[in-house]
Design a protein with these regions (language model features):
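Nuclease catalytic cores that cleave nucleic-acid phosphodiester bonds
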Residues: 83-216
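Domain-level signal for Mg2+-assisted phosphodiester chemistry and nucleotide/NA-binding surfaces
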Residues: 1-103, 107-111, 160, 166-167
């Protein structure tokens, strides 16, 4: 009997670890990525994607629109559950890395944009699925060491399998130590897991969603 498997995708971590450097990879078919990564003796019963909606940024004027197109594409393709956090803007005072001169002020007033709740939402979803006995195997796509606590709980208390696929190129020794199985995602793997350039939907396929040209 195949193991019931749920895949949890940390969108923020995946983006900065694997997708940001290659615009074409942003048009990623998350379901297909999960199917490629998960061993064949497992049955994927859910793929859960945790992300936050981008706020308008004059430095990246198309980012919000492109993300909305992508989220609609995922919805139309199906097979993905999306849970959203949010971005929070904060005024902050930060020190210069190097003091410019002895008489200069060593701090600058900056605006910090921080992604909130995605990691908490992911960890909470794992715990709920564990306690409701929704899965035998838990697969996490993230390099965030903050997830060690739920990983340990599910492994040690529940005696379930927890697999971590790290989207970053660097090794996360902490995650590797705590997971049942750990692997860094190959840098070229997203090229095999992209959505179609055009996704048709509607009763007769009369409507369509297109990959943003900047992501081609």
């Amino acid at each position: 009997m195949k193991k019931r498997t749920i895949v949890y995708i940390d969108g923020f971590n995946l983006y900065y670890g694997l997708l940001r450097s290659c615009p074409a990879y942003k048009w990623l078919d998350l379901r297909k990525l999960a199917e490629v990564l998960v061993a064949p003796e497992n049955e994927i019963v859910a793929v859960k994607y945790f992300t936050s909606r981008v706020n308008y940024d004059p430095k990246r004027p198309t980012a919000k629109e492109h993300q909305e197109i992508y989220l609609r594409a995922l919805q139309k393709v199906g097979g993905i559950e999306v849970t959203e956090g949010y971005y929070q803007r904060q005024d902050a005072r930060m020190p210069f890395r190097f003091e410019p001169c002895k008489s200069c002020r060593p701090y600058a007033d900056v605006i910090r944009i921080e992604e909130k709740r995605s990691d908490v939402n992911l960890a909470t979803a794992m715990m709920v699925d564990f306690h409701e006995d929704n899965a035998d195997s838990f697969v996490i796509i993230s390099g965030d060491a903050d997830l060690i606590a739920p990983i340990d709980y599910i492994r040690k208390i529940g005696r379930r399998t927890v697999v971590v696929f790290n989207p970053h190129a660097s090794l996360s020794g902490d995650l590797k130590k705590h997971a049942t199985f750990y692997k860094n995602i190959p840098r070229d793997l997203p090229a095999q897991c992209l959505l179609p350039d055009m996704i048709r939907y509607g009763k007769h396929g009369e409507r369509s969603i297109h990959r943003p040209p900047a992501w081609a």
